[in-house]
From Swiss-Prot:
Keyword Metal-binding attached: yes
Presence of keyword ATP-binding: no
Gene Ontology BP terms: protein histidyl modification to diphthamide
Protein known as: 2-(3-amino-3-carboxypropyl)histidine synthase subunit 2
Cellular component, GO, one term: 2-(3-amino-3-carboxypropyl)histidine synthase complex
Pathway annotation from the record: Protein modification; peptidyl-diphthamide biosynthesis
Function according to Swiss-Prot or TrEMBL: Required for the first step of diphthamide biosynthesis, a post-translational modification of histidine which occurs in elongation factor 2. Dph1 and dph2 transfer a 3-amino-3-carboxypropyl (ACP) group from S-adenosyl-L-methionine (SAM) to a histidine residue, the reaction is assisted by a reduction system comprising dph3 and a NADH-dependent reductase. Facilitates the reduction of the catalytic iron-sulfur cluster found in the dph1 subunit.
Source organism (scientific name): Nematostella vectensis (Starlet sea anemone)
């Protein structure tokens, strides 16, 4: 598939300024079409989907596809419509904003040589691993079927059925690589895997569990599924399904995965074996469990290795971002998801935390994140991204200002707490009732400190938790012995630091003139321009 490229100073496609160019634009999408209907029924679990739709009485179903599966989307929708007697709507990804959205159904169908036409084609607001409930609600959908890679974040608005697909994998080869990496059969190993290999984990467990009694294989347990038999779950680790009342094992749940650890042990006592290619899922696991030794097996290349990624170096980079966030005075809270449960709660918590720390905050909802969008707000010192765990870690090298996680922002604001190296990518862990939740008090240290970034003295004009929730019209009793301290507004400081501050007003020098009638019409044609 050919791709049109144009050399420009900014990464903006030339087609963005022409409607005809947008229609004719070809998208470089790595997608292949499944030729056999039988294979499509198996891979996309058509029968399971139909059973869920018919048993629950759903009439409108939204089908969410990533770029890599768009070639099969129309055929899958047709099969579901025919077998479940419902309306199927396609929610398609747009490559994280790198390509212009397709303006019409016919253009989309033409790209993939599809002859069937559906009533609606919507596009995702954020990353394709998250369930886009907003786009589905626009179509009045009653159920979302999410295909392909998924972050398994909890949703609340609509029921979600996950169909991960069945990427090919040689179980025998995988088990051989596992034995080569772990010759000691008594070692404690925790197995994670990409969701697209969930279909073969039962066979892998049967091949390895007799040899490795201390091996634990995680199970995919997404939340938000309609009530239906969880055929994706296997019977491995039976102790994990009956944990209540048992004291021998510890049941853990992270990132939509359940796993059970031995009694009197912690995650740091285990080595982790990951099945899948290099991905956001692997990076998220390595940052979260940074004290564990990771080994990976890639079914595509049939290669395994011990991961030598310097996690400490990555953590040092994140620590640098925390110091940048500590010095920030104006913070932008970027909403990176509208579908993950409790995203509004973490936004409100961040606003309160920033207010107590003496930082001014603004909330931005801008869809898929890119450099150009954030570059429009030069006044912001640092951005906080509220997103799913897999998309919360942003490499800020291309961005003009740092982009940090809610956990990093809280560490930066809480001066009395030192970072131990433990890392949290899931913002749910910061909410009340969770283990990482921090209780804010009014005795937080507000003394000046020396910035590790600039080497200068920094002041944070903190307010109490009570004041953070009050309006500026509240009355307080004045203390007659209080000394006066002045603070220059942050906006004035930023304006004073700019080399160009706007046109000179020349007060008293410019003559006052009578107001006259201006131009009428729109930019395409004003009334005084004629035909």
């Amino acid at each position: 598939m050919e791709v049109e490229t144009t050399a420009k100073s900014y990464d903006v496609p030339a087609s963005a300024f022409s409607e005809s160019a947008v229609i004719d634009t070809h998208l470089d999408v790595p997608s292949t079409k499944t030729e056999s209907i039988e294979r499509m029924v198996e891979v996309y679990e058509i029968e399971r989907s139909v059973q869920v739709i018919t048993s629950s009485g759903f009439n409108k179903v939204a089908l969410q596809f990533p770029d890599s599966l768009l070639a099969d989307s129309a055929s899958v929708a047709r099969l579901i419509e025919q077998r479940a007697s419902c309306k199927a709507f396609i929610l398609a990804d747009t490559s994280y904003g790198r390509h212009p959205p397709l303006p019409a159904n016919k253009t989309f169908l033409k790209l993939y040589n599809v002859r069937i036409c559906f009533k609606l084609l919507a596009f995702l607001h954020f990353s394709s691993c998250c369930v886009d409930e907003i786009a589905a609600e626009h179509a009045d959908a009653e159920l979302i079927i999410h295909y392909g890679q998924a972050c398994l974040s909890q949703t609340k608005r609509l029921p979600v059925l996950y169909v991960f697909g069945k990427n090919p994998i040689n179980v025998i080869e995988c088990s051989q690589h596992f034995r080569q990496l772990y010759p000691d059969t008594g070692i404690r190993v925790l197995v994670f895997y990409d969701v697209v290999y969930n279909h073969c984990i039962g066979a892998l467990d049967e091949a390895l569990s007799p040899l490795y009694p201390n091996m634990t294989i995680s199970t995919i347990a997404p939340e938000g599924l309609p009530s239906e038999p969880t055929s994706q779950q296997s019977s491995r680790n039976p102790q994990a399904s009956d944990v209540e009342g048992m004291e021998v094992n510890q049941c853990n749940r992270r990132f939509g995965r359940d796993f059970t650890l031995a009694a009197n042990s912690s995650i740091s006592d285990y080595q982790i074996f990951y099945i899948g290619e290099q991905s956001l899922t692997l990076r998220n696991l390595m940052m979260t469990y940074n004290k564990c030794q990771f080994s990976t097996y890639d079914p595509i290349t049939n290669e395994s290795r011990r991961e030598t990624l310097n996690v400490n170096k990555a953590l040092m980079k994140r620590y640098h971002m925390i110091q940048r966030a500590k010095d920030a005075q104006i913070v932008g809270i970027v909403v990176g998801t509208l579908g993950v449960a409790d995203y509004l709660k973490i936004i409100e918590r961040l606003k309160k935390v920033l207010a107590i720390a003496g930082k001014k905050s603004y909330v931005f909802v801008m869809g898929k994140l890119n450099v150009a969008k954030l570059a429009n707000f030069l006044e912001i010192d640092v951005f906080v991204l509220v997103s799913c765990p897999e998309n919360s870690l942003i490499d800020s090298k291309e961005f003009y200002k740092p982009v940090v996680t809610p956990y990093e922002m809280e560490i930066a604001c809480l001066r009395t707490q030192e970072w131990t190296g433990d890392y949290v990518t899931d913002f749910h862990e910061l909410l009340p009732g969770k283990s990482i939740n921090t209780f804010w008090t009014d005795d937080n240290d507000d003394s000046p400190y020396i910035s590790l970034i600039t080497g200068k003295m920094q002041h944070n004009y903190k307010s109490s938790a009570k004041e953070a929730g009050e309006t500026s019209t509240s009355l307080v009793q004045r203390n007659q012995e209080t000394t006066l301290a002045t603070q220059q507004p942050l906006t004035a400081e930023f304006l004073a630091s700019r080399s160009w501050q706007g046109l000179q007003q020349n007060l008293g020098d410019t003559p006052v003139t009578t107001a006259v009638e201006g131009r009428r019409g729109i930019a395409a044609g004003y009334t005084d321009e004629g035909e």
